[in-house]
Swiss-Prot record:
Keywords on record: Lyase, Metal-binding, Pyruvate
Gene3D superfamilies noted in UniProt: Phosphoenolpyruvate-binding domains (3.20.20.60)
Protein name according to UniProt: Hydroxypyruvate/pyruvate aldolase
Cofactor: a divalent metal cation
Assigned protein family: Belongs to the HpcH/HpaI aldolase family.
Binding site for a divalent metal cation: 151, 177
Provenance organism: Cupriavidus necator (strain ATCC 17699 / DSM 428 / KCTC 22496 / NCIMB 10442 / H16 / Stanier 337) (Ralstonia eutropha)
UniProt enzyme class: lyase
Length: 269
């Protein structure tokens, strides 16, 4: 069968993709989220307590649904990328890519030789349906949608070079880490940070690559989409639950909850 990755196809066509961030590390909630109507779900392996096995379980949980899973690795490590691709990850987000050299290494890790250095173990891999997909090795490289995160001042300085790397399908701006890198830790909504984010998005879009980010602020999400951002995560599962639970508990108390305001959006999470 030909290479098949609906998320990659949508990004290439610049069709806006609205996503939800999954940080609870449970396949049950991943499946619930798959029924919500989002275009994509981010299974987080960087800041959420996911490992290879829990990531596999999440992929299996959402597989019956049309929503597209994207997996964020804890780092752009070659052995880990090999394992993630083997368990069936087709859309991969790699954090903290600061240079074109790093971007090229990540691309190489997602390609089989001679184009790259990915180890060949497809016969025992979920990705090939355990060899039921007899043409898997022929189409595997084309099925990968590779996204890298630019989330430091250094990355923004090198953004044009990163975008120019062949094999990078999109660049995701990480607002929280970028804010910290700019000296505004915990304040991704700071005007200087927002100006940097919007400038970076324009650079990415001008390069022909897809731009993406995360924000729980609906107005800001729409602003990014209007700028031409293609893939935007608009909420985080654990925050949605925590805020709803706190609000419900507070509604039955005489005193307002001392917890953070549930309805206050964040430019980062």
């Amino acid at each position: 069968m030909p290479a098949n990755n609906p998320f990659k196809t949508a990004l290439a066509a610049r069709q806006a993709q609205i996503g939800l961030w999954l940080s609870m590390a449970t396949p049950y909630l991943a499946e619930v989220s798959a029924t919500a109507g989002f275009d994509w779900l981010l299974i987080d392996g960087e800041h959420a307590p996911n490992d290879l096995r829990s990531t596999l379980h999440a992929l299996q949980a959402v597989a019956p649904y049309p929503v597209q899973p994207v997996v964020r690795a804890v780092a752009g490590e070659v052995p880990l990328i090999k394992q993630l691709l083997d368990i069936g990850v087709r859309s991969l987000l790699v954090p903290m890519v600061d240079t074109a050299e790093q971007a090229r290494m990540v691309v190489s890790a997602t390609r089989y030789p001679p184009q790259g250095i990915r180890g060949v173990g497809s016969a025992i891999a979920r990705a090939s349906q355990w060899s039921a997909r007899t043409d898997y090795l022929d189409v595997a490289d084309d099925e990968v949608c590779l996204l890298v995160q630019a989330e430091t001042v250094t990355a923004l300085q090198n953004l044009e070079a990163i975008c120019a790397v062949d094999g990078i399908d999109g660049v995701f701006i990480g607002p929280a880490d970028l804010a910290a890198s700019m000296g505004h830790r915990g304040r991704p909504g700071h005007p200087e940070v927002q100006a940097a984010i919007e400038g970076a998005m324009r650079t990415i879009i001008a390069s022909g690559k897809a731009a993406g980010t995360l924000t729980s602020d609906p107005a800001l999400a729409r602003r990014y989409l209007d700028l031409g951002c293609t893939f935007v995560a608009t909420g985080v599962d654990v925050m949605l639950y925590a805020n709803a639970a706190r609000k419900l508990a507070a509604s039955f108390r005489e005193q307002p909850s001392d917890a953070p305001a549930a309805d206050k959006p964040s430019a980062a999470y």
